[in-house]
From Swiss-Prot:
Alphabetical UniProt keywords: Cytolysis, Cytoplasmic vesicle, Disulfide bond, Glycoprotein, Membrane, Transmembrane, Transmembrane beta strand, Transmembrane helix, Virulence
Membrane topology annotation: Multi-pass membrane protein
Organism: Toxoplasma gondii (strain ATCC 50861 / VEG)
Compositionally biased residues, Basic and acidic residues: 162-177, 184-194
Gene name of this polypeptide: PLP1
Nucleotidyltransferase among keywords: no
Residues in coiled coil: none
Name this protein carries in UniProt: Perforin-like protein 1
Length: 1161
């Protein structure tokens, strides 16, 4: 049976054997019979007005005359008005449906009127969206939601393809209507409207990639609210029968699909884009300019059966010469196009039938063209000029440019997705379901890998070419990795060599490569592997002129340009063996001159290497050969060795030194230095060192002229009057005044200018700096990092020996400057500062002074454990000393003691030691560095907890020894020690004595306020205090902060009483301990035997003789002056026994000074 469904409504049910036809439809059913008859199914009249259903039976075999008869019958039915719309209740509407339709009519009426050429969507305020071709999906059950109830209809266990067609309409606030068609023998499952929204994707190709490709966001054709409405498709079953979609779907430009299927099968149809449909129409109508099958998006507009693979396509079936290709109604072996040119795909046992053109497939009047192949039906050319009576003629237009653009976009999207999809394996879930051979996959992967490698090679080729362009290095790179002698060096420059005399031969051997590691980041120059090079263009003049008052100021000025990593000083006696250092020492010793320094920098390059101990650098052949000759020990470090630094200074060829390995080490250090350069700024530097008379400086100050500004003006640095707060008259005097100064200019890098005062000459010099740069600022690292581990300790000992043997000693400075350096005097003239409070805290020196020595302690005698006890040394040369630790509880306390002076004593070195936790039973020992001995220090034993002070003890170190020890006390848990060391040849060292005392300790007595015990630390006889402190340790340290005091200088004793604080309860008392430590100086030590002492002694003696009638009782601050009275004959000197006792309490001691001989010098 062949059924043609001319549905004018979106709602109807299946038709099977001419039975049960739903409302509002005209159906022509043709049976295989011997005669043609038109008879109503439900009405007696042959042509009643607006009949519902008719059947047209005849014999099965189609032919051309049967086609003509069928077409004439259909045309006649249309002329008699049988294709009119019928309302839901079966009544015939008025003749003029267009006039009877109101804006409030149902969507079905609006769709009906639009289909037969009535008012358009704009007039009816409704929008019509054409059908789209759909795909078939296997489902097991359908859930249908009506306006009244929800019904579930389970299907058979086997998957039944079901086709759902939707029409979309949009109206204000309306819901979506969907109608599902099912088998004819089932009852209606849907009577109302389903309140659901279509979720069909608009993209024509998304369903091909649903296995792993995410869906695109839905893009509606209409703006505003959209609704979907379903139009049913008729089904028929039986051998050799074929199905056709309704003619009304043709009017709506919807592709109809008819399939040979079992009667339990259903299909689900999703809408497709209007642009896609118009593209197919244009192609079927044969409009010029349409693309071929291979380029049109219609080529991919096909349904995919999810349960089977496609076996043949239309082109293959036509090429085989299938006899059914031109059959109008199809045959038992395949599907053919219907009379209106629709191509239908059918599925039977996993086989896809071929599709052919139908009646209107090639005619210009065909409303749609859904076939993938151009129809070969001869009726297409015969009826080319016949108008389609069932469609709106205005909607049949050729493909627009916009539709063609949409088609190309769809084709482009498909081509973009196809390669991605083809990369997937041929798994059963894959969309194409093709078994790809493994060899093909391997070949494809191999080709893809070859393309990737080729692309990488093409990308890397320009980079390698860029790297090969870098062929030069920066001019000053040869200084990087060079050795440096910190004792003989001088970054400012040497007057004789006009350069830094500390630069030594290269130590590091660099490797270069033209790659990303061997070329600078700007791809201009080569750089060492593991290092870096970059341009650094900067020329600046110092904003301020530095006034150098002493050797410490000079050393600090040099350390700005040459320092260890982080800016710390290089080491002992740094730069002291250079000519510039000796000259400045002579100049600064003169009290009638003032020295100033001004620097100008012009930097061009910066270079550096990685400063890591884990990086093994390559060294030069000469350095490696020198290291191989070094022994593993340094003989002079042995106390029994007779070759000391003093012996080497006096006679290095003496037998005491030649029999040792000391010459080998000294030769190695003199050749390669003590350090090596790891970072440098290369360019030029011009240093002005100006010396002016003291009287000249005082005269300028009296005139109101700023000395530093005047020097800048004379040196060409700044304009007159800059930075001065004087009157205009004084400014005029400043501009007219010329200082009488002695100027020395040192130039490093570039071509030295002829006249350093000429700006043009200075500009020419700055231009030559880039071609001839030299290190103007650099950082160094100790050379022992490049030595084997077994030789590093010996190298450190050798460097200390070298610094003392070659550099200036205190005796040398005394002889050079004519000023006696005496350690007790220097310490006595310093300022003591004691601070207490919560940790960390800090103690600060008075203005203009820096730290000479000191310590910071963290104490807690209430909490158990030993982690609450810490001690560190205060770094010299800084303005303050920071505490140690943090306050984790209210009983954590800090104590800081520092000694401040105008300049640090570089020869003093501090040592701190702590015992491991719970090691109180072991003796703690600390040693001074090489060639140094103890000046003073103390050791303390402590224990945590409220009763820890019961085990507290303190001991002093012995002056002149190289080791200081602290023996534990009973019950102690931790020992810590602090001491200071100095060169054993330092003047006045033998005058000092250390004293430590533990006073009252035990339970605190709150009734004895400020008198709870005492501590009294006394100096030995004939000595006075140089420095020291007294302190009270308490269970609650926060309540005794005021009981931490420094001892008065020149006094004979230092004492303090307890505060009397007890916060214990019942029989639990707080503990406390009072203790102190002092350094005393003796008064019977002869003065230093130097020539200047003789002159001062005679002068002082004459001066004293002139003071007749004066009280001969000397104040404590006159003790040292009295020591130098009459060096030629014995003198009586009064020394107070206790400075606090007043002038009436004094003890006299006579001492006889040894005669001074010039031969002793």
């Amino acid at each position: 049976m062949f059924v043609v469904d001319l549905s004018l409504s979106g709602n109807m049910r299946s038709l099977t054997h001419g039975k049960s036809i739903h409302r509002s439809s005209i159906v022509v059913v043709t049976h295989c019979s011997h005669r043609l008859s038109l008879s109503p199914l439900n009405r007696p009249a042959l042509f009643p007005s607006h009949s519902d259903r008719y059947t047209v039976p005849w014999r099965c075999r189609p032919s051309s005359w049967r086609l003509w008869i069928t077409f004439v019958c259909l045309l006649t039915l249309h002329m008699f008005g049988l294709s009119s719309a019928v309302k839901r209740d079966g009544e015939v509407p008025t003749a003029n449906l267009r006039a009877s339709l109101s804006p409030d009519s149902s969507k079905e009426d609006a769709m009906l009127l639009s289909a037969i050429g009535g008012i358009g969507p704009t007039e009816s305020r409704l929008q019509h969206i054409p059908f789209r071709t759909t795909r078939y999906l296997p489902i097991r059950s359908h859930v249908l939601q009506s306006t009244v109830e929800r019904i579930e209809s389970p299907e058979a266990l086997n998957e039944v393809p079901t086709k759902v067609e939707r029409n979309e309409f949009t109206e204000k606030g309306d819901k979506t209507e969907q109608v599902l068609t099912a088998q004819a023998d089932h009852k209606s499952l849907l009577e109302g409207r389903s309140e659901s929204t279509s979720t069909a994707p608009d993209d024509d190709f998304d369903f091909l990639f649903e296995d792993d490709t995410p869906k695109k966001p839905k893009s509606r054709v209409n703006k505003g609210t959209s609704s979907d409405e379903t139009s049913p498709g008729d089904r028929s079953s039986g051998e050799g029968s074929s199905a056709s979609d309704s003619l009304l779907s043709v009017v709506h430009r919807t592709k109809g699909n008819a399939t040979q299927a079992n009667k339990n099968q259903k299909r689900i149809t999703h809408p497709k884009s209007k642009a896609q449909h118009q593209k197919k129409v244009t192609k079927k109508q044969g409009i010029p300019g349409s693309d071929s099958l291979g380029t049109s998006s219609a080529d991919f507009d096909f349904d995919i059966d999810s349960s089977s693979n496609t076996q043949a396509d239309d082109s293959q079936r036509q090429s085989l010469g299938d006899s059914s290709a031109l059959d109008l109604f199809g045959s038992d072996t395949g599907d053919t196009g219907d009379i209106f040119g629709f191509s239908n795909s059918s599925s039977d046992g996993g086989n896809a039938a071929a599709n052919d053109g139908g009646l209107f497939s090639s005619s210009g009047m065909g409303p749609t063209g859904a076939s993938d192949e151009t129809s070969a039906n001869p009726l297409g050319s015969i009826l080319g000029g016949v108008l389609n009576p069932f469609a709106q003629q205005q909607s049949i237009t050729p493909m627009t440019d916009k539709a063609d653009e949409w088609s190309k976009e769809n084709m482009k999207a498909f081509e973009e997705k196809m390669p991605k999809k083809m990369r997937d394996d041929g798994s059963p879930d894959s969309w194409y379901k093709q078994a790809v051979p493994q060899e093909s996959v391997a070949d494809l992967n191999r080709m893809r890998e070859n393309r990737r490698i080729a692309e990488e090679n093409r990308a890397a080729a320009p980079l390698s070419a860029v790297y090969t362009k870098a062929t030069k290095t920066v001019p000053a790179i040869n200084y990087l990795g060079a050795g440096y002698d910190h004792v003989r060096g001088n970054p400012v420059g040497d007057p004789s060599s006009m350069g830094d005399p500390g630069i030594r031969p290269p130590v590091l051997r660099f490797t270069y490569a033209q790659n990303e590691d061997g070329v600078s980041n700007d791809l201009t120059v080569l750089q060492p592997l593991g290092g870096y090079v970059r341009q650094y263009v900067a020329c600046r003049q110092s904003e301020t002129i530095s006034e150098l008052s002493n050797l410490s100021d000079y050393q600090n000025e040099l350390s700005v340009d040459a320092s260890l990593q982080g800016g710390d000083p290089i080491g002992l006696n740094s730069f002291s063996a250079s000519t510039g250092y000796r000259d400045f020492a002579k100049e600064v010793s003169k009290k009638d001159t003032r020295t100033y320094m001004l620097k100008n920098y012009c930097m061009r390059y910066e270079a550096g290497v990685a400063q890591s101990n884990h990086l093994k650098w390559n060294v030069t052949l000469a350095f490696a050969a020198g290291v191989s000759q070094l022994p593993d020990v340094f003989d002079a470090h042995n106390p029994e060795c007779a070759c000391s630094a003093e012996q080497w200074r006096q006679d290095q060829n003496a037998e005491a030194c030649t029999k040792t390995n000391v010459p080998i080490w000294i030769s190695f250090i003199e050749q390669f230095g003590t350090h090596f350069l790891v970072r440098l700024f290369a360019g030029g530097k011009m240093t002005y060192q100006v010396t002016a008379k003291r009287s000249e400086v005082e005269k300028m100050r009296n005139m109101g002229i700023d000395v530093k500004t005047q020097l800048k003006m004379q040196l060409g640095g700044v304009s007159g009057g800059a930075g001065q707060g004087t009157s205009s008259k004084k400014n005029q005097s400043s501009s007219e005044y010329q200082m009488n100064v002695q100027k020395e200019t040192l130039v490093i890098g570039g071509r030295p200018p002829g006249n350093v005062s000429d700006p043009a000459a200075l500009a020419a010099w700055a231009d030559t700096v880039e071609e001839l740069p030299m290190p103007v600022k650099f950082e160094v690292q100790p050379l022992y990092h490049l030595l084997p581990v077994e030789k590093q300790e010996a190298f450190k000992q050798a460097v200390t020996f070298y610094s003392k043997a070659v550099g200036l000693t205190p005796q040398d400075l005394s002889a050079l400057t004519g000023v006696t350096r005496n350690l007790p005097k220097q310490l006595t003239q310093a300022t003591q500062v004691a601070w207490s409070g919560p940790p960390p805290g800090f103690a600060k020196c008075p203005a203009g002074q820096v730290v000479i020595l000191g310590f910071a302690m963290h104490l807690n005698f209430k909490e158990p454990g030993t982690d609450n006890f810490r001690i560190i040394s205060c770094p010299p040369g800084r303005e303050k000393c920071d505490g140690v630790g943090t306050a984790s509880s209210e009983t954590d306390e800090g104590r800081i003691y520092i000694l401040c002076g105008e300049e640090p004593i570089n020869e003093i070195q501090q040592v701190v030691a702590e015992s491991p936790a719970h090691a109180g039973a072991s003796v703690l020992e600390a040693s001074c560095p090489d060639e140094t001995v103890v000046v003073g220090g103390f050791g303390i034993s402590v224990r945590g907890g409220s009763d820890g002070l019961d085990s507290f003890s303190i001991e002093s170190c012995t002056t002149g020894q190289t080791i200081c020890t602290k023996a534990p006390t009973r019950g102690s848990e931790k020992n810590f020690l602090w001491m200071m060391c100095v060169d054993k040849q330092y003047p006045g060292l033998r005058e000092l004595v250390n004293v430590a005392e533990l006073g009252s300790h035990g339970n605190a007595n709150k009734r004895a306020v400020n008198s709870d015990g005492n501590v009294d630390v006394k100096c030995p006889a004939n000595s006075s205090i140089v420095l020291g402190y007294v302190m009270e340790a308490h269970t609650n340290m926060q309540f005794v902060r005021d009981k931490f005091l420094q001892c008065p200088e020149n006094a004979s004793e230092c004492k303090m009483t307890g505060k009397g604080v007890d916060h214990g309860m019942l029989w639990l008392f707080d503990r406390h301990a009072l203790f102190g430590w002092i350094i005393c100086k003796t008064v019977n030590e002869p003065a230093m035997h130097v020539a200047t002492d003789v002159g001062k002694a005679k002068g002082n003696g004459k001066k004293k003789k002139g003071k007749k009638g004066k009280n001969k009782t000397n104040a404590p601050n006159e003790v040292e002056e009295g020591q130098q009275l009459g060096a030629d004959s014995p003198s009586q000197v009064s020394v107070p026994a206790d400075a606090d006792s007043g002038p009436t309490s004094k003890t006299m001691s006579s001492l006889k000074l040894a005669p001074v001989k010039l031969l002793d010098l």
